[in-house]
Amino acid sequence: MLSALARPASAVLRRSFSTSAQNNAKVAVLGASGGIGQPLSLLLKNSPLVSRLTLYDIAHTPGVAADLSHIETKATVKGYLGPEQLPDCLKGCDVVVIPAGVPRKPGMTRDDLFNTNATIVATLTSACAQHCPEAMICVIANPVNSTIPITAEVFKKHGVYNPNKIFGVTTLDIVRANTFVAELKGLDPARVNVPVIGGHAGKTIIPLISQCTPKVDFPQDQLTALTGRIQEAGTEVVKAKAGAGSATLSMAYAGARFVFSLVDAMNGKEGVVECSFVKSQETECTYFSTPLLLGKKGIEKNLGIGKVSSFEEKMISDAIPELKASIKKGEDFVKTLK
């Protein structure tokens, strides 16, 4: 049922170029000058769903904004530079996307980014809590398994926490799963949908191939290899880029897909489903990614895990200890802040 509800991967990006969509979303990108931020900002500028695009970073944002502002689409673009300009960037925003932070290099795990990115995310989300407390917050900055608990605890500190509006963007895992399944089966990836649950790092990434639409079957050895490739796809890109960065273009695509789905739902479109790492009661983990029915106020309904195979069931139980540790690490970090 979950997979049937979820739209094919590219449908939402295609819609973002249609002229009938409401053009009213005010979107901020924090970390807009970086490897993900620039192509993400380009995709957002290209969409009629967005009426105002505000870009923030600690360097180069005026140039990125000037460059994007010449594109012949409706969204107005303005760049903001440095902490003193951050409040103005956020005022009146409906959606804030946070790709800010340092990328992975070869040999690094997403968790190795924690010390740097935890501080960046805490600082940026604190500003969001003060200047756009009602906005949808979409966190791309890794490690997502920790940066979402950080975001939640920061919002709690400011007394404006709403669990239905804070999202860890795991969409790239779904995009990769769709692509890799389509490659193996000779299908159009735009017509494949694989729910991916759990978290957004290594073995916490749990593709539910048994729930794939259309239904696909793999022998166990191929299924194990496919699952491993989906889990380590980010590392595949880091290695291929040989020290020159991590997944930026595919992450920008996935981030834009999630934002467009969210804005569609905020505009009243029904049946919009995306997986995301959010506050959850679906497992013993306090945060967990599952398919979510999105609505005007964020999460309308958590659609849960659904029926899974014994292979997937084992992956879920194996992921929980690591997820719990990452969640605790994020929550404990906020306790150390002034």
Swiss-Prot record:
Cite the binding residues for substrate: R104, R110, N142, R176
Q: Which residues are glycosylated?
A: S33
Residue positions of the PTM Phosphoserine? S246, S326
Reaction catalysed by this chain?
(S)-malate + NAD(+) = oxaloacetate + NADH + H(+)
Question: What are the entry keywords?
Answer: Acetylation, Glycoprotein, Mitochondrion, NAD, Oxidoreductase, Phosphoprotein, Transit peptide, Tricarboxylic acid cycle
What's an example GO cellular component term for this entry? Answer: mitochondrial matrix
Q: What class of enzyme is it?
A: oxidoreductase
Could you tell me which Gene3D superfamilies the record lists for this protein?
Lactate dehydrogenase/glycoside hydrolase, family 4, C-terminal, NAD(P)-binding Rossmann-like Domain
The processes (GO biological process) annotated in the record are: aerobic respiration; malate metabolic process; NADH metabolic process; tricarboxylic acid cycle
Pfam name, any one: Ldh_1_N
Q: Where is the transit peptide?
A: 1-24
N6-acetyllysine sites (modified residues)? K78, K91, K165, K185, K215, K239, K296, K301, K307, K314, K324, K328, K329, K335
Residues the record lists as N6-malonyllysine modifications: K239, K307, K329
Places the protein is found? Mitochondrion matrix
Q: What is its EC number?
A: 1.1.1.37
Q: Which InterPro entries match?
A: L-lactate/malate_DH (IPR001557), Lactate/malate_DH_C (IPR022383), Lactate/malate_DH_N (IPR001236), Lactate_DH/Glyco_Ohase_4_C (IPR015955), Malate_DH_AS (IPR001252), Malate_DH_type1 (IPR010097), NAD(P)-bd_dom_sf (IPR036291)
Q: What is this protein called?
A: Malate dehydrogenase, mitochondrial
